[in-house]
Amino acid sequence: MGNYATLIGESDGIIQLTTWNVGKWDGKLKIGDYALISPGVRILSAKMITIGNSCMFGRGAYVTDSDWHGVYDRNEVAGSPKEVILEDNVWIGDSAIICKGVRIGKNSIIGAGSVVTKNVEPNSIYAGNPAKFVKKLDEQEIIPRKNFYSNPKKLKDDFEILDKLALKDNTLFGWIKSFFYRNKDH
């Protein structure tokens, strides 16, 4: 895991970063600097998944380098894995699926709910099932996520504002009440 990663977990959106290291399988996962990983993201490796700098993952996105079972022999562990590479500054939308053997070019965006089975050109938007080319992006206009960290004072102030907004409805009375009138999900 690189520097300045932001992982946002929730009780109903646990983040799963898994490498499968059994027998002939030696999964590896490399995540670059400034990654943003939202609730429910699953990244599962039986071979190698490389994620570049400033990549962002929407809620429930899934990246895998394996089928996890053979096509005919469902007991065959991990099928035949193929490396996955996400170059720098890639944005994977909510619930998108990135399949084995895929390379996503730098600055590209994958639309929510898309299923990516083939390589994606740099500076492009792809969407759909299967994902198809939608639009070319102007590389000169793209501002990478790492720029968010260029002013530490502003970053600290911004996070304090976000914390206040997230917690504004919390009160001492509400906290005490939660002990006596528990939500059925908690």
Model-derived segments and their meaning:
Residues 1-102, 137:
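Flexible, glycine/small-residue-enriched loop-and-beta-strand segment within the central core
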Residues 12, 121, 139-141:
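Short cysteine/histidine-rich zinc-coordinating motifs and their immediately flanking basic loops
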Residues 26-27, 33, 76-99, 129-186:
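C-terminal segments of enzyme domains that contribute to small-molecule binding surfaces
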Residues 102, 114, 120, 129:
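Short beta-to-alpha loop/turn elements within the nucleotide-binding domains of ABC transporters
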Residues 105-108, 121-123:
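Conserved catalytic segment of ABC-fold P-loop ATPases
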Residues 109-111, 115:
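A generic "structured core" feature
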Residues 118-123, 153:
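Short arginine-rich
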Residues 126:
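Conserved active-site beta-strand element of glycosyltransferases/polysaccharide synthases
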